[in-house]
C-alpha cells in the first residue's frame, strides 16, 4: 500500500448499472467503500479495495454493448483496420459481452470469453463460439488445450475490472501466438477529465 496515494473518497456506493424497482427500495442495498488511489509504481489510478467480480458480473448483468451506437461504430472501424492490417486467422475476445465486436468477423475464427451467463446466452443463440468464465490462468489453459493459440487477442473495458493483472497477462501470454497482436481498450482518467465525462 505504500505506493498508493489516496486522493478521492466517494464513500459507500451501490453497484453500478443496478437500479431498484419501487418495491425494492425498502430492502437494504449492499454498498462498497470506494476510495480512489494513484499508484506511484505503475502510474495507474484505481480503487483502493476491489470487491468480488461475481457481485457485479453475474447472470443479472444489465449492460449490452450493442445498445451503444458509439460502441458499435467504434468496433466496426477497429475491425476494418484489423482485417486490413493484421489479417488474423484466429481471434479471442476477453469480455465479449453480446458479441458486438466479434460479429464484425467470421464466426468460425472467433472465440469470446464472457462471465455473465445471461449475456453469454445471447451470443450462443447467435451461434457465436462463447465460453462462460472469468479470465484467469485456469481458463486460459482450458482454451489452450482446445484452440491452441490466437494471432489476435482483444479486450475492451474488461481488464480494469480484474484484480490480479499479473495473472491476466500470464494467461494472455499462454494463448497469444508468437507473432500475435494484443489490443486492449480501457478508460483513461486523463481523457475523462479532459472531456468532463464520467466514463470513456
Where are these regions (language model features)?
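Conserved SAM-binding motif I beta-strand of class I
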Residues: 109-114, 132
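Conserved SAM-binding strand-loop segment of SAM-dependent methyltransferases
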Residues: 126-142
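Short, glycine-/aromatic-enriched active-site segment of Class I SAM-dependent methyltransferases
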Residues: 184-200
Amino acid at each position: 500500500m505504500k505506493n498508493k496515494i489516496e486522493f478521492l473518497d466517494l464513500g459507500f456506493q451501490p453497484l453500478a448499472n443496478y437500479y431498484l424497482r419501487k418495491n425494492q427500495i425498502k430492502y437494504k442495498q449492499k454498498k462498497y467503500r470506494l476510495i480512489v488511489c494513484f499508484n506511484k509504481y505503475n502510474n495507474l489510478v484505481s480503487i483502493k479495495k476491489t470487491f468480488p467480480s461475481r457481485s457485479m458480473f453475474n447472470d443479472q448483468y444489465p449492460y449490452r454493448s450493442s445498445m451503444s451506437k458509439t460502441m458499435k461504430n467504434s468496433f466496426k472501424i477497429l475491425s476494418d483496420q484489423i482485417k486490413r492490417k493484421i489479417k488474423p486467422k484466429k481471434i479471442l475476445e476477453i469480455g465479449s459481452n453480446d458479441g458486438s465486436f466479434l460479429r464484425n468477423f467470421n464466426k468460425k475464427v472467433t472465440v469470446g470469453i464472457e462471465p455473465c451467463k445471461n449475456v453469454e446466452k445471447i451470443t450462443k443463440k447467435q451461434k457465436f463460439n462463447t465460453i462462460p468464465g472469468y479470465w484467469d490462468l485456469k481458463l486460459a489453459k482450458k482454451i489452450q488445450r482446445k484452440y491452441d493459440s490466437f494471432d489476435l487477442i482483444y479486450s475492451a473495458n474488461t481488464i480494469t475490472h480484474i484484480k490480479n493483472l499479473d495473472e491476466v497477462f500470464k494467461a494472455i501470454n499462454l494463448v497469444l501466438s508468437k507473432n500475435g497482436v494484443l489490443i486492449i481498450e480501457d478508460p483513461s482518467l486523463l481523457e475523462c477529465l479532459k472531456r468532463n465525462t464520467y466514463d470513456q
